[in-house]
Amino acid sequence: MRALDIAGTGMQAQQTNVEVISNNIANMTTTGFKRQRAEFQDLIYQNLRRVGSNSSDSGSLLPSGAQVGLGVQTAAIYRINEQGNLQQTGNTLDLAIQGNGYFQVTLPSGETAYTRDGTFGLSPEGQIVNTNGYVVAPGITIPTNATGVTINTSGQVQITLDGQTAPTTVGQISIATFPNEAGLDAQGDNLFLQTSASGNPVTGNPASPGFGSTLQGFVESSNVNVVTEITDLITAQRAYEMNSKVITASDEMLSTLTNLH
């Protein structure tokens, strides 16, 4: 009985849906996290009577066919890249991007990774690094005798030194955008890598055309909406239960049919 397999695909799809929702809820306080959404599509159809076929009686064209779908499958899990709320931290090295763009960090392998998490600090060498100790590109060093650090909305990093009143520029933070952000490969640790699907990164200074601006002393909160996630969770749970009831009903029908023989 096909209904057993069809309902099974429905349960698998909703299990994936619940896993995505669970991950969203788990990361509701993760800095720079973007919620995800599972998308589904129907499977192939079995033709009981092909659309556009001729009637065996009169030879006339039948106005409709008889097709039975074979279930559902996960088509994609999209990342919703809506802006998260900005949270003030009081840390002068923390940065939030308001608008488009990703910070760039250099991995130990030399590869560049991308992130919306602007929780930054200093390495023992005085370089600006993320929470994993990866250097924020293009690599900016703050001298030990600096008494203050200012990062403007354009990503320009300036310091104040002892005995000086005028600030000194020590670097420029650049950010990157992609033709297709959905094509980025999530690595964990709030990091992404480019892929052939994302396209090559386009880098530029914050607040320039096409790029968001940087805000010092802030980080971007997760864009997860708990009310939305709980609503989606209830919907997915009910859909899972309905599919399980189809399996139960189909099994009972199959048992009845077997007993007739």
For the regions a language model picked out, list residue spans one by one.
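Amphipathic alpha-helical polymerization modules
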Residues: 1-261
